[in-house]
């Protein structure tokens, strides 16, 4: 149980941890229906409609290394959400793109974020301010750019 005046309640990293954990739990409830984890969801949402991305670029976009991405992409490929193809010029370079099923599911999944945040006591304006503040925090402190 969350205790407002506790030492932990004043710790930024604890508040990030609790928020992240609880938000992901809400997403998980919605994603079960599609056989997806939260990580699978963010990977699918990170690939643009007709885009081909190599694993390195995709990893940078979702802040995951290739060791985490490779097995996840294999699972997404088995579900026919993505296709992995090798470049003819350099077979070491694996390109990731959405299948038609992946594009269809991406359209369905795009509404999940709004559904999740409708369950919280937060206004649209507060949500937007929080997103902007966190984008700035990540960009300034972790030498990573969050695509806006």
UniProtKB/Swiss-Prot annotation:
Q: Where is it located?
A: Cytoplasm
Annotated GO CC locations: cytoplasm
Q: Which residues form the HTH marR-type domain?
A: 9-139
Q: Which UniProt keywords apply?
A: Cytoplasm, DNA-binding, Transcription, Transcription regulation
PROSITE patterns hit by this protein: HTH_MARR_2 (PS50995)
Which Pfam families does this UniProt record tie to the protein? Staph_reg_Sar_Rot
One GO MF term, please? DNA binding
Write down the PANTHER family for this protein, in alphabetical order.
Answer: TRANSCRIPTIONAL REGULATOR, MARR, TRANSCRIPTIONAL REPRESSOR OF EMRAB OPERON
> Per its record, how is this protein called by name?
HTH-type transcriptional regulator SarZ
Naturally occurring in which organism (per UniProt): Staphylococcus epidermidis (strain ATCC 35984 / DSM 28319 / BCRC 17069 / CCUG 31568 / BM 3577 / RP62A)
């Amino acid at each position: 149980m969350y205790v407002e005046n506790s030492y932990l309640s004043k710790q930024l990293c604890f508040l990030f941890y609790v928020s992240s954990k609880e938000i992901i739990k809400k997403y998980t409830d919605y994603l079960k229906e599609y056989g997806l984890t939260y990580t699978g969801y963010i990977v699918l949402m990170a690939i643009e409609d007709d885009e081909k991305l190599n694993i390195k670029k995709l990893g940078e976009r979702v802040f995951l290394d290739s060791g985490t991405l490779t097995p996840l992409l294999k699972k997404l490929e088995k579900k026919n959400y993505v296709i992995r193809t090798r470049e003819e010029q350099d077979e070491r370079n694996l390109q990731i793109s959405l299948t038609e099923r992946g594009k269809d599911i991406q359209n369905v999944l795009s509404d999940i974020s709004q559904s999740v945040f409708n369950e919280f006591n937060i206004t649209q304006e507060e949500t937007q301010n929080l997103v902007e503040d966190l984008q700035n925090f990540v960009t300034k402190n972790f030498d990573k750019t969050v695509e806006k």
